[in-house]
């Protein structure tokens, strides 16, 4: 009987079509998983539709933001160069000069923000095309989890603060009661 069971185990059919078996003879990279290794045919596959759409949407947006950043920076530097001599010449009229310098500094900060936004946009597009970043739904799920954690933390802190205030109020009542009952020559309230 034991030999029959052993023979059954030896002849088990393992050709289940639902399980992916690695194909080592395939010419699609390492292990047949579509890697881009030594035997890759990456050039014949081409980019996916999502990658093309991301490139079409991301490059103009990133380029526009970088252009805006450059123009804003140039305008801010010119404004700053004009405002410094004006400030020195017309120092009695300090309010317009301060306003000019404030606008120049605001322009420089706006330029930096445009540049940072443009670079992060281009970086995201490149990471998306390389496949190294999470997908948008995964990023949204992560953001939702972070928001839920923050709300939970704020709720916990609110409860702790409420308990703290309640304890302090109880402490103050006890201290007041102890002060009233132990003062010499005074009777307790309510008697």
Curated annotation (Swiss-Prot):
It is a multi-pass membrane protein. InterPro entries: Oleosin. May have a structural role to stabilize the lipid body during desiccation of the seed by preventing coalescence of the oil. Probably interacts with both lipid and phospholipid moieties of lipid bodies. May also provide recognition signals for specific lipase anchorage in lipolysis during seedling growth. PANTHER family: OLEOSIN (PTHR33203), OLEOSIN 20.3 KDA (PTHR33203:SF44). One of its GO terms (cellular component) is monolayer-surrounded lipid storage body. Residues 55-128 are annotated as: Hydrophobic. GO terms for biological process: response to freezing; seed germination; seed oilbody biogenesis. It is found in: Lipid droplet; Membrane. Residues 2-54 are annotated as: Polar. PROSITE patterns: OLEOSINS (PS00811). The keyword Membrane applies. Belongs to the oleosin family. The modification N-acetylalanine is found at residue 2. The keyword NAD does not apply. This is Oleosin 20.3 kDa. The chain crosses the membrane at residues 52-72, 99-119.
């Amino acid at each position: 009987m034991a030999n029959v069971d052993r023979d059954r185990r030896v002849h088990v059919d393992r050709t289940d079509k639902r399980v992916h078996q690695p194909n080592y003879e395939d010419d699609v990279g390492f292990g047949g998983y579509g890697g881009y290794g030594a035997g890759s045919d990456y050039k014949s596959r081409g980019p996916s539709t999502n990658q093309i759409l991301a490139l079409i949407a991301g490059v103009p947006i990133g380029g526009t933001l970088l252009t805006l950043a450059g123009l804003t920076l140039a305008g801010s530097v010119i404004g700053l160069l004009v405002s410094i001599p004006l400030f020195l010449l017309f120092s009695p009229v300090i309010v317009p000069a301060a306003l000019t310098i404030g606008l120049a500094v605001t322009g420089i900060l706006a330029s930096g923000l445009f540049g940072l936004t443009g670079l992060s946009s281009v970086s995201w597009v490149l990471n998306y095309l390389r496949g190294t970043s999470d997908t948008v739904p995964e990023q949204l799920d992560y953001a939702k989890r972070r928001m839920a954690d923050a709300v939970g933390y704020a709720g916990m802190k609110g409860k702790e603060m409420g308990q703290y205030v309640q304890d302090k109020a109880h402490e103050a009542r006890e201290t007041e009661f102890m002060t009233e009952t132990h003062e010499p020559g005074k009777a307790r309230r309510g008697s």
